[in-house]
Amino acid sequence: MFKTVDEAIHFIESQRTKRSFEDFQKIIERYQIPIDLKNVIHVAGTNGKGSTVTFIKDLLMKQGYHVGTFTSPYIIKHHERISVDGKPISDDDLLRFINQLLPLIQQEHLSMFEIDTLIMLYYFNELDLDYHIIECGIGGLHDKTNVIKSNVAVITNIGYDHQFMLGDTLLEIAHHKVGIVKENVPLFTTEQNKEILSYFKDYCTKHQSTFYPLQVEKQYQYPYHLHFHQKEYVLHLPTYQVSNLTLALNVVDYLCDLNDEDIQAVIDDF
């Protein structure tokens, strides 16, 4: 048992066990970990995951929903990985859950990411939130977050990352990322590579999933402009954020109604 949250975090961050996705799945089943969350948005991709998660979260919160986010890595402190309505898990809750799960963690020698995943699952289940945005750690197909049943899959883009685990070609990497798409779960992406999009389309067809490939407006002059629902929005943001915002807008529009004022407010506050 840990007496302080600093002791607990030091312990969490020192755990580096390597384990297959299948073995982690067996642990989930053996200990009956609560993996059923409602309205799960699963986000994978090489770049832009963090910004896309933030845009989706802010848009949903503008509609009055309570939103949990699971992200990595953290910027300032470990707590940020598990947040509700933009507020990181408290010291007391983090300490409570790590002590509650400590026998399991020590018995199974869980890694840091596995520990955080379990804490997130117990914490979010306790709160009964409206939406949950879950960001993959590495890849998608074998990422430990893929034990969760999602309602929407999101892939920002495909680039060369973690090649020692995901493969040396873009298609091999795409295969891992698109692995978050489950039966009848729609996929949204702003990937523009035609070969990768064709691969995504075939994968979605096999899994009876609707595929939403999104076009991103080319920007040549600052400030940038984005057209959505027959309205133009002015963006005082870096050009790469146009893609992330386009993705977030379409995902949230699929889930609930959006209005112009809320969209502009999120853009202005980012």
Task: Report each predicted region and the residues it spans.
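Short functional linear segments
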Residues: 1-45, 52-54, 58-65, 70
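ATP-dependent carboxylate-amine ligase catalytic core
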Residues: 28-29, 33-36, 62-148, 164-166, ...
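Short, intrinsically disordered, charge-balanced linker/junction segments flanking boundaries
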Residues: 264-270
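Acidic, Mg2+-coordinating active-site environments of NTP-dependent enzymes
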Residues: 131, 135, 152-232, 241-263
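Aromatic/hydrophobic pocket-lining residues that form π-stacking "cages" and hydrophobic walls in ligand
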Residues: 56, 120, 198-200
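A short glycine/serine-rich beta->alpha loop
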Residues: 105-109, 233-239
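Conserved active-site and cofactor/substrate-binding residues in soluble primary-metabolism enzymes
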Residues: 22, 51, 89-92, 96, ...
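ATP-dependent carboxylate-amine ligase
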Residues: 1-5, 148-149, 254
